[in-house]
């Protein structure tokens, strides 16, 4: 039976039924038939392949993804709000926990903003600046190793996963030697660093560089020389330069589309313009290109670390201004705040005024002139920006972060729609989102 009252009309939004009466059963039956294969699938937020508590809502037609959306917010910790209730130095202990795989980038971006407001950018000791670069490049290595290891694990390449975490452990051992902690260091402070490198640190660094140079070619053999790995990555998660620019994607996602945009070159900070290194790019616009870029960036990071070691001259690691500087020249105490017994004995033996000043500096903090600044660093995932606003007090009025994981995750839909369900995992892994940074 046919009826002129219910005629389906195909549009870009789907099939539209114009009904003016007649057989409703036929309308329903026709609609059900047209949407027979349409299924909504929730991938996550506890899915092992979504890099944390990320929820992906997928509309699939058979094996093809017709629509993809992100659900975020499951790891919201209120870090930006908490910063408004702590002094400027205490802020580093919060920001280091955002993207927990790149703590030194979070800390450095925040401290560069605070230093810009204070007007002390030119007063930061050279040794502190070189050590910041050194720590950031080590951190870039460890972040890329996790990305490659977890990406390999999700594809079933468990050997890459084991190798990646093996090498990352070497970096975390160095962090533990330098800062006392494997993660969440709060080592970069406004004005410099919490303390200097311990004895023997440079020798350990040289050993690490030698080991990593030996280990990096293994990833080439396991991945780039593996036809199954390449077939699984090539032409998957495709996003061209136009799409990257429209969605604000940065980092390896943007560079895989052929644009050599890297803030270390285009808008240098911490003296990066004086270092010799290349910005790797690809023209594949896919997950495989992003993988190759991260592999090459690790080699470039080793180059920069070697240059940092050559530039390490003896000197202070904190500004000379005692109204800002926390004690950095003495060993840290058990509380991790620079209040070692040596320091307490030193200031108590000097004068009561020095003791009062130290007490006020730690409890109340220093004042930052009113104003607002935006600073950005090139994190392993892309542009990590921070907008810092001061009202002239001892606490931030507002601190907002532009996290690259959050921005790049918007590209997930463009990468996945029209592809296979299995390729969603590869596309998300190539973005390398960390939910601590996305949700903050």
UniProtKB/Swiss-Prot annotation:
SUPFAM superfamilies per the UniProt record, alphabetical? HydB/Nqo4-like (SSF56762)
GO cellular component terms, A-Z: plasma membrane
Q: What is its EC number?
A: 7.1.1.-
UniProt keywords, alphabetically: Cell membrane, Membrane, NAD, Quinone, Translocase, Transport
Question: Which Pfam families does this one have?
Answer: Complex1_49kDa
Alphabetical list of InterPro entries matching this protein = NADH_Q_OxRdtase_suD, NADH_UbQ_OxRdtase_49kDa_CS, NDH1_su_D/H, NiFe-Hase_large
Q: What is its main location?
A: membrane
What's its catalytic activity? Answer: a quinone + NADH + 5 H(+)(in) = a quinol + NAD(+) + 4 H(+)(out)
Q: How does it sit in the membrane?
A: Peripheral membrane protein
Localization recorded for this chain is: Cell membrane
A GO MF term: NAD binding
Top-level EC class as recorded in UniProt: translocase
Q: Which Gene3D superfamilies match?
A: Cytochrome-c3 Hydrogenase, chain B
Q: What is its biological role?
A: NDH-1 shuttles electrons from NADH, via FMN and iron-sulfur (Fe-S) centers, to quinones in the respiratory chain. The immediate electron acceptor for the enzyme in this species is believed to be a menaquinone. Couples the redox reaction to proton translocation (for every two electrons transferred, four hydrogen ions are translocated across the cytoplasmic membrane), and thus conserves the redox energy in a proton gradient.
Q: How does it assemble?
A: NDH-1 is composed of 14 different subunits. Subunits NuoB, C, D, E, F, and G constitute the peripheral sector of the complex.
Q: Which family does it belong to?
A: Belongs to the complex I 49 kDa subunit family.
Q: Which NCBIfam families match?
A: NuoD, PRK06075.1
HAMAP family recorded: NDH1_NuoD
Protein name, per record: NADH-quinone oxidoreductase subunit D 1
Which organism does this sequence originate in? Streptomyces griseus subsp. griseus (strain JCM 4626 / CBS 651.72 / NBRC 13350 / KCC S-0626 / ISP 5235)
Its taxonomic path starts at: Bacteria, Bacillati, Actinomycetota, Actinomycetes, Kitasatosporales
């Amino acid at each position: 039976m046919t009826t002129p009252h219910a005629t389906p009309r195909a549009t870009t939004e789907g099939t539209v039924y114009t009904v003016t009466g007649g057989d409703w059963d036929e309308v329903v039956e026709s609609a059900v038939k047209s949407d027979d294969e349409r299924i909504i699938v929730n991938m996550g937020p506890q899915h092992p392949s979504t890099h944390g508590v990320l929820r992906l809502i997928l509309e699939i037609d058979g094996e093809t993804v017709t629509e993809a959306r992100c659900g975020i917010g499951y790891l919201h910790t209120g870090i930006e709000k908490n910063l408004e209730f702590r002094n400027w130095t205490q802020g580093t202990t919060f920001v280091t926990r955002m993207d927990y795989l790149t703590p030194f980038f979070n800390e450095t971006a925040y401290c560069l903003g605070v230093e810009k407001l204070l007007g002390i950018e030119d007063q930061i000791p050279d040794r502190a600046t070189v050590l910041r670069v050194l720590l950031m490049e080590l951190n870039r290595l460890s972040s890329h190793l996790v990305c490659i290891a977890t990406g390999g694990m999700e594809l079933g390449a468990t050997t890459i996963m084991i190798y990646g975490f093996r090498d990352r452990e070497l970096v975390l051992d160095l962090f533990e030697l330098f800062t006392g902690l494997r993660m969440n260091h709060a080592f970069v402070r406004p004005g410099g660093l919490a303390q200097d490198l311990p004895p023997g640190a440079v020798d350990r660094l040289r050993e690490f560089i030698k080991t990593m140079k030996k280990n990096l070619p293994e990833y080439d053999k396991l991945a780039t020389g593996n036809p199954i790995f390449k077939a699984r990555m090539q032409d998957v998660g495709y996003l061209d330069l136009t799409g990257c620019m429209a969605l604000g994607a940065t980092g390896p996602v943007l560079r895989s589309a052929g644009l050599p945009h890297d803030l270390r070159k285009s808008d240098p900070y911490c003296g990066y313009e004086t270092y010799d290194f290349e910005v790797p790019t690809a023209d594949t616009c896919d997950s495989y290109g992003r993988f190759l870029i991260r592999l090459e960036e690790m080699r470039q990071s080793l180059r920069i670390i070697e240059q940092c070691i050559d530039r390490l001259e003896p000197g202070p690691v904190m500004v000379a201004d005692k109204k800002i500087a926390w004690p950095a020249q003495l060993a840290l105490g058990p509380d991790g705040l620079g209040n070692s017994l040596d320091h307490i004995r030193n200031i108590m033996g000097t004068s009561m005024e020095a003791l009062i000043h130290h007490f006020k500096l730690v409890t109340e903090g220093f004042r930052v002139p009113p104003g607002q600044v935006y600073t950005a660093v090139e994190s392993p995932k892309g542009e990590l920006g921070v907008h810092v606003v001061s009202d002239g007090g001892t606490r931030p009025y507002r601190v907002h972060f532009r996290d690259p994981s959050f921005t790049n995750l918007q590209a997930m839909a463009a990468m996945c729609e029209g592809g296979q369900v299995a390729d969603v995992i590869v596309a998300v892994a190539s973005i390398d989102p960390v939910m601590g940074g996305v949700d903050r």
